[in-house]
Amino acid sequence: MNINTMNKHTTNLNIIKNINNINNLNSIKELLLLLNNKRLNRSLNKTYIWDYLNELSNKGVKLQHLNNINSWSSQIYKFNKTEEINNTIYDRLVTKLLTKLLVLNINNKIYKLIISKPIFEHSINKVNIKFFYYLSYKNINKNINNNNNLINNIYSNYKFNINSKLINLLNNNINSISNILSLYYNKDVSFEPIQLKYNYMNSDILAKSLKIMNSSSKRSLSMNRIKNLMNNMPKLNDKLISQTYINNINNIMFNKYNNIIKSINNNNNNNPADSSPGNPRGGAAGKLYNIIYENNNINTIPNNILMFKYLVGWSIQLKGRLSNNKSISRSNTMNILNGTFQNYKYIWGNQMVNNYKLNYIPVNHNITNISDVNKNGKYNIKVKLNTI
């Protein structure tokens, strides 16, 4: 028997073992599913089922119900108090470090990226640092006269160069920032930069953009420039978006749990699953999948329940001496508001039902305060965004 024949024989044995393991696993899943169904049949009754569905319905109308830790700026695994304090100190230092270091040299031109406040995800063996950044192509089209195709081509190359240099600076090079920071954290460090197409998609980036606009302009932040910014930002119907979002979640949840309860009452005889090798969801997994999502389009569910897609309200507060006019008061304040910040379901209902007065949607606010000093004095920029 030659070596090739032995290798083929070994490969066939491994395939047979894998098939047997998969069949055993599917058999165990089938058994557990049947045991679970019998237990639920004994314990559930109609009154309990409807109470359970009503409770899920009330929880489902909260936009923040699916993601309660999205706004955390630091997620630390609490295994040691001293280590937790050290990680918090390092996180603050890294935040300042990234703001200073993210300056790239491309074609002998210096580009400074506008970044958001980083989000630190700590685990036992790794630290993942996530942040948003914004690229502006205004600097590359000053000498181009209304040639949109040329601007788009240059911007695409410019964006690719910056993205590749950014990844090399953070993660890939031997002397990258991640390798250096791993010596301080005593664990692997990785960066996850996320590019934003518009500066108004993050409050930190929008506030920093206003600060740069104020420092680079001879006229500072005039009302005309604020109006131009307002015209570029979207104006969405928050009532329609919120109601559509709530209806999508309610429909998905009611269909899913009604399908489960219906299958329990029918003893799983009405929804047979295809357990052939070509079916990726065969056996117990395929049966459970078909039961839960019988009346739902699985391809549209992620997009329907995706959060923070729409900006429905924003405000900008300018305080202090932003103007070049030296006679302006320090207490001068200008407030600009567009959209809404009150995402309450009962406001939009036709009937003021007492059951819905406490059933509100948590407001998703992103707030950033930035202070700086110019030649006339100190000023403050406060940006507040409401996303759904």
Curated annotation (Swiss-Prot):
One of its GO terms (biological process) is translation. Its main location: mitochondrion. It holds the Pfam family VAR1. GO terms for molecular function: structural constituent of ribosome. InterPro entries: Ribosomal_uS3m_fun (IPR007980). Keywords: Mitochondrion, Ribonucleoprotein, Ribosomal protein. It comes from the Eukaryota. The keyword Lipid biosynthesis does not apply. GO terms for cellular component: mitochondrion; ribonucleoprotein complex; ribosome. Coiled coil: none annotated. The keyword Mitochondrion applies. It is found in: Mitochondrion. Essential for mitochondrial protein synthesis and required for the maturation of small ribosomal subunits. Belongs to the universal ribosomal protein uS3 family. This is Small ribosomal subunit protein uS3m. It comes from Kluyveromyces lactis (strain ATCC 8585 / CBS 2359 / DSM 70799 / NBRC 1267 / NRRL Y-1140 / WM37) (Yeast). The gene is VAR1.
